[in-house]
Amino acid sequence: MGSVEDILGELNRDAFVSLLQKVIGESEHVQNNPPELIPQELLVANHVLEVLRPLSTECGGPLIVNHVSYSPGRSNLIVEYPGTESGKILSFVGMHMDVVTANPADWEFNPFALSIDGDKLCGRGTTDCLGHVALVTQLMKKLGETKPKLKSTVVAVFIASEENSSITGIGVDALVKNGLLDKLKNGPLFWIDTADKQPCIGTGGMIPWKVHVTGKLFHSGLPHKAINALELGMEATKEIQLRFYKDFPAHPKEKDYGFATPSTMKPTQWSYPGGGINQIPGECTIAGDVRLTPFYNVSDVMKKLQEYVDDINQNIEKLDTRGPVSHYVLPDENLRGRLSISFEEATSGVACNLDSRGFHVLCKATEKVVGYVKPYSITGSLPLIRELQEEGFDVQTAGYGLMATYHAKNEYCLLSDMAQGYKVFTSIISQLED
């Protein structure tokens, strides 16, 4: 018998594209943006099952297929190719069957149907993450067909509900809670939902915040009688940012992990109730996010941001003003401008274990197949994987779509990249036999 890599061979490109065409055809129905758009991952899962069920134990094949749903139409699939040694295992997880939304009017092609332009495979989900669903399905199909004798059990976990966290208990969080992934802790877990063919070794945490500013509305010809909420908001945001960067500077470990940026705190949205050009606004809301490298604690940052706001409120007269009649206190009216801060659900970043066997085999496989290895880190966030890490899983992350098209209009991936991803997977399986 040849080597594992010889047996598993190359990606069957025709079969991959055929399956991808079917799952991209469902992408309109797996957009995830509740309450308007609740994905029906069952539609994608059915196409995966159509490929793998003939090779399952119920049909006399080697694959153990477990279809798990915690809500109607919200499917997860756990597919297992058993090895010969108890406790020896590796897994490919995170291939999610939902997608972010797409507006066909903004695209150069139909986002909800696969179109092929040479090496380019175009459509919503090609990079994130239906392309990976189809890719890992082909890997498990090849294992089921060729039946190599492996020491390690190989498990693939296709999940629901990755793109939105407003509805919980549907996807990988529920699988972990119910113990269905416990045995995956005995070996490396490869989360297949990043891009650019290199190991992603660090991701950022995210804290969405809103600062509501209250001043006093008045005629713009009498600015001394107003508290300008816009000016107060600008100066307060600047002060909060200055304090944040003092307390959470670039961390020494960020260089080791290759983070492109340190932690950041910035506004991204601004709103106010409206009014005439001759009215000084009495309130406004500034919203934004903190992107936090994984070497800082999310709860520590939230506590600090609240402290900044409390201190600014207590000392609001010390805040910089804008011009001779700009002020944030009206003593004669016993009025003070004020701020309040609130947070939406925060997520923590991840720093992968660079000493683990999983990381080393991923790097070696990448170098062999792609020709070089250059791990990277971003302060973009990958939900769910920090929780897996805290539960005791050795999580490593990789992906074979394109970062440039991630969540973007005119999303596409390259067939040649996906074919290399398949070879990386077979190299990982082969190395872990030693």
Q: Regions from the language model: what does each represent?
A:
Residues 129-203:
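Acidic/histidine-rich catalytic neighborhood of metal-dependent amide-processing enzymes
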